[in-house]
Amino acid sequence: MPDKDEITHDAQSENEESLPLARPEGQFMKSIALDTPNSPEVFSIMKNPPEVDVQCNIDSRAIDERNGVYEVVLDLKTEARIKDKDSPDETRVAFVCKLKYCGVFTIKNLTQEQLRQTLLVEAPTLLFPFARRIIATATTDAGFPPLMLAPINFAQKYAESQRD
C-alpha cells in the first residue's frame, strides 16, 4: 500500500501539470545588420541628433506544440536620418539597424487567447530590453551616439491589433 507522502506527491504532480505555465527557456540573436551607407561623410554633417524611425514586428511559431515550446521573434528595424547641412530640406541616412532577437518559451495549459497574448505581449515585453541594449551597443560601435529605443507598450499594440 502506498504511503501518504507518495499519494500527496502524485496528486501534486498531476495538479502542477494542469496549471498554466509560461516559462522562458532561452533567448538569442538570430540576425543583426547595421549599415552606414553615407559614412564617413555623415559624421562631418551630423550636428543634431538624427531623426529615428522604428519599426517593430513580432512573429511566433510552435517549435514543439505537443510539449508547448514556442519561438518568439522580435523583429526591429531602425533607420536614422540626419539633415544635410548644405540642403536643410533634405535628409541622409545615417544608419539602418536590423535586429531579429528571439526567445524560446514553454507555454502550457492556456486558452488560445491567453496563448496569443503570451506570445504577442508577455514574451516581447521580456525580450525588448535585451534587444534595446544590443541596438544601443551596435550604434555606438558604428561611431554614433547610442540609440536608446523608447519602451514599447506591447499590450497596447496587441489591443489595437484586435480592434482592426
From Swiss-Prot:
- Give the UniProt record's GO annotations in the biological process aspect: protein folding; protein tetramerization; protein transport
Q: Which GO terms describe its molecular function?
A: unfolded protein binding
Q: Where is this region: Disordered?
A: 1-22
- Entry GO CC: cytoplasm
> Is Cytoplasm tagged as a keyword?
yes
Gene3D superfamilies, alphabetically? SecB-like
Keywords of the record = Chaperone, Cytoplasm, Protein transport, Translocation, Transport
List, as start-end ranges, the regions of compositional bias called Basic and acidic residues. Answer: 1-12
Identify the main location.
cytoplasm
Which Pfam families does the UniProt entry name for this protein?
A: SecB
Please state where this protein is localized.
Answer: Cytoplasm
Is Nucleus there in the keyword field? no
Give the NCBIfam families listed for this entry.
Answer: PRK05751.1-3, secB
Q: What does this protein do?
A: One of the proteins required for the normal export of preproteins out of the cell cytoplasm. It is a molecular chaperone that binds to a subset of precursor proteins, maintaining them in a translocation-competent state. It also specifically binds to its receptor SecA.
What family, per the record? Belongs to the SecB family.
**Which PANTHER family does the UniProt entry name for this protein?**
PROTEIN-EXPORT PROTEIN SECB, PTHR36918
Indicate the quaternary assembly: Homotetramer, a dimer of dimers. One homotetramer interacts with 1 SecA dimer.
Protein's name in the database: Protein-export protein SecB
